[in-house]
Every structure is written in structure tokens, then in C-alpha cells.
Amino acid sequence: MNFAEAMREQARLQALRALASAPDYTAADTVLQRVLQADGVAVAMSSLRIELSWLNEQGFVVTQRPGGATGVTIAT
């Protein structure tokens, strides 16, 4: 595993942890980006959206894009 791959995995894990503690297990991607940065995982919005799409494809989250920001909810 190279460094970039490790950082992508860390971003996905931190996003899931943030959602697990969010009200209704839901947050906007902009909020997730700030939480990740506060946890020391600096990620560009475009990169975060790619990782959120990956989590969606794997069935871990459900993403919705009503208007600009992407809403993310842990899949149940």
C-alpha cells in the first residue's frame, strides 16, 4: 500500500466515524471536510466526493445531491 492509498482509506474511515456521531447519521460533505481537517486528514473537496462516491458504491453510505452540497447518510 502506498501513501496516497493509505490517506484515501483514512479519509473514508474518518468520514464514517464522523457520520456515526452525527445527528441522524447524516452530514453535508462540507461539514465532513471540516471534521476531517480537524482530525488531521486534509482532503480537497473533489477528493472527498470521490471517496464518498466509493463508500456509496460499496453500500456503506447513501449520498444525495440536492443543490450543490452532497448530503451523506450511513446506509442502514
Please annotate each region the language model reported.
Residues 1-26, 42:
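Short alpha-helical segments that sit at the start of domains
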Residues 25-36:
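Short acidic, hydrophobic short linear motifs in intrinsically disordered regions
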Residues 32, 51-55, 69:
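A short glycine/small-residue-enriched secondary-structure motif
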Residues 39:
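Carbohydrate-binding/catalytic loop surfaces
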Residues 42-57:
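Short amphipathic alpha-helical interaction segments
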Residues 56-66:
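A short, conserved structural fragment
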Residues 66-76:
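Short, cationic-aromatic polyanion-contact patches
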